[in-house]
């Protein structure tokens, strides 16, 4: 983060971190009793990885300023990054957990399956998706949008690079995208592109606001320098970093509502209006 801390963007669904209750926005202060900051990110990541069955103790500062320690048992994480189903009113639902090496291919297969079932609309769930590979989100946006701007980057020399979709394929169904405070980076590229191109209604909470390309320059054994090399902008020129994507329909978290997903319920309500 800007103040040199290591922040949790969003724990991977089904991961040891999610299971013990680590949340988006939590600050990792220590690992196995040793203090860490963003300049020692690579070492921190190494400490958290390792053999299945090993224990690691993570010291967390949560959003309310409370310090907690969590003991995690390391386990392999091989998430299938895309899942889909048909929900009420014959609405197609696709959840993207993160953007990894085969996510765009998985998205295509899941959408083709839903299309065969003649769904009337599509809800894309990007909640708690921390991002991932930019080429994968560009591919998915290209599958969804007709010829349009997806995102552009601007570096310190004011050089812009534009990413656009072509006319080979597009999804013409009514669409709703679900986001929350754990939707970051590549998730914000996709939701921003669909919002600016008026291809989907965005429902949920303000997103995380991670819109920079960064690298760590190692400075010997004692630390490193975090370099921001470029920034992402939505097609309409909105800054993502530090701001996030503002939903068209705001719905607060469902955490305190027993067995009810109020954000998904609102997305379905919005979709019903679209497919009347």
Positions of PLM-derived features:
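Short acidic, Pro/Gly- and aromatic-enriched capping/linker segments at domain boundaries
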Residues: 221, 226-230
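Conserved functional hotspot residues or short segments at active or partner-binding sites
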Residues: 240, 258, 262-276
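Cleft-lining beta-strand/loop regions that shape enzyme active-site pockets
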Residues: 7-10, 18-24, 29-35, 42-210, ...
């Amino acid at each position: 983060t800007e103040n040199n801390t290591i922040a949790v963007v969003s724990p991977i669904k089904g991961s040891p971190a999610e299971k013990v209750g680590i949340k988006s926005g939590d600050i990792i202060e220590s690992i196995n009793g040793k203090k860490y900051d963003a300049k020692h990110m690579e070492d921190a990541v190494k400490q958290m990885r390792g053999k299945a069955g090993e224990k690691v103790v993570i010291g967390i500062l949560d959003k309310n300023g409370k310090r907690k320690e969590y003991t995690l048992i390391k386990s392999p994480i091989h998430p299938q990054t895309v899942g889909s189903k048909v929900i009420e009113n014959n609405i197609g639902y696709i959840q993207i957990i993160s953007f990894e090496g085969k996510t765009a291919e998985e998205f295509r297969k899941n959408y083709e399956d839903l299309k065969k079932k003649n769904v009337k609309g599509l809800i894309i769930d990007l909640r708690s998706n921390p991002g991932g590979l930019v080429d994968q989100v560009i591919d998915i946006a290209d599958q969804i949008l007709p010829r349009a701007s997806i995102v552009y980057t601007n570096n310190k020399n004011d050089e812009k690079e534009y990413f656009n979709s072509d006319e080979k394929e597009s999804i013409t169904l009514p669409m709703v995208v679900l986001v929350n405070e754990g939707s970051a980076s590549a998730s914000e590229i996709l939701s921003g592109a669909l919002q600016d191109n008026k291809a989907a209604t965005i429902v949920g909470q303000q997103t995380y606001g991670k819109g920079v390309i960064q690298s760590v320059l190692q400075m010997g054994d004692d630390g490193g320098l975090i370099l921001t090399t470029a920034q992402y902008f939505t097609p309409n020129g909105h800054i993502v970093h530090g701001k996030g994507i503002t939903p068209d329909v705001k719905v607060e978290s469902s955490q305190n509502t027993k067995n009810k997903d109020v954000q998904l319920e609102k997305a379905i309500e919005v979709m019903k209006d679209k497919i009347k």
